[in-house]
C-alpha cells in the first residue's frame, strides 16, 4: 500500500513532463516560412504532409516528418521501385505505408483526397507541380522548395525547419559528416578533375551535374575537383531554369565530358560499358584510361539515403 502514493507521484511527474514538452512544442508555432510566393504562416506543426515532388520525399522520410503521400515517377525503371518511389528509400516508404499520389502528371484531386495540412512543391525539375500552385494552395498551405541550388544537407535543414524536425535533420547530417570524414581519410582520389553526369545511352545524351548541384557539392566535400566546361559550349535546358544540371547532346556531349575521370550517377556497369562502347567518346581521356565509374542506380537524386550509398561506393572504388 505504501507504493500507491509513490506510484501516483510518478504518474503526476510523468504527466507534468509530457505537458511541458507539449507546451514547448506548441510555443514553436505558428511559424513564418518564406518562399518565392511570399511569406506563409503555419499555425501548427504539420501532421499530414503531401509531397508532390519525389525528390523532396526522401529528405522528409529521413527526418521522420509525417509525409503521408508523394508524387511518383515511372515504376520499375532504373531509379524507381514498383511504386515509382526512388530506390534508395523504397524500403522506408513501404514501412511507413507512404501512399502514391500519381505517376508523373500532377493531380490536384489526388492531393486533396489526402486531406493534407501542408503541401510541398519543387520549384524546378520533372517532378515539379508548380503549374498547379493556385489550385493546391486552396487545399492547404503550399510551399515551393528549390532543391536545384543547394546541397542535400541544406535542403534537409530547410525541411527540418518547416516541419519542426530540426533535431532529426541535424542528427542525420551529423551521422553523414562522421562517415564523410572517415571516407576522406580512406579514399585515394583518381585523376582530376572529374565530370559527374547522368548518362542516357539510348539518346546519346547526358545531364551534367554543376558545382551548384547536390552531387557536385558532395564530390567537392570529398576533395574532388569538378572539371570546367569549355568556353562557348552551347548546352540546352529544360524543366525550367535549373542550376543543378546542364544538358549535353549531339556534338556537345563529347566536349562536355572533359574530366580526367567520369562519375555516372543513376548508373551501373552497363552504363559505363555503354560509354566505353560509344565510338564518339573513344577519344576522351577518361575513356582511354578506363576512368569511368558507375555510382549506382540509387543515386539519381541525392538525399541522406543515397548520399550514404555514394560514400560506400566511393570507398569501395578508391
Swiss-Prot record:
GO terms for biological process: DNA damage response; ferric-enterobactin import into cell; iron import into cell. GO terms for cellular component: ATP-binding cassette (ABC) transporter complex, substrate-binding subunit-containing; membrane; outer membrane-bounded periplasmic space. Coiled coil: none annotated. The keyword Ion transport applies. Gene3D superfamilies: Nitrogenase molybdenum iron protein domain. The complex is composed of two ATP-binding proteins (FepC), two transmembrane proteins (FepD and FepG) and a solute-binding protein (FepB). Part of the ABC transporter complex FepBDGC involved in ferric enterobactin uptake. Binds ferric enterobactin. Can also bind ferric enantioenterobactin, the left-handed stereoisomer of the natural E.coli siderophore, and the apo-siderophore, enterobactin, but does not bind ferric agrobactin. This is Ferric enterobactin-binding periplasmic protein FepB. The lineage of its organism: Bacteria, Pseudomonadati, Pseudomonadota, Gammaproteobacteria, Enterobacterales.
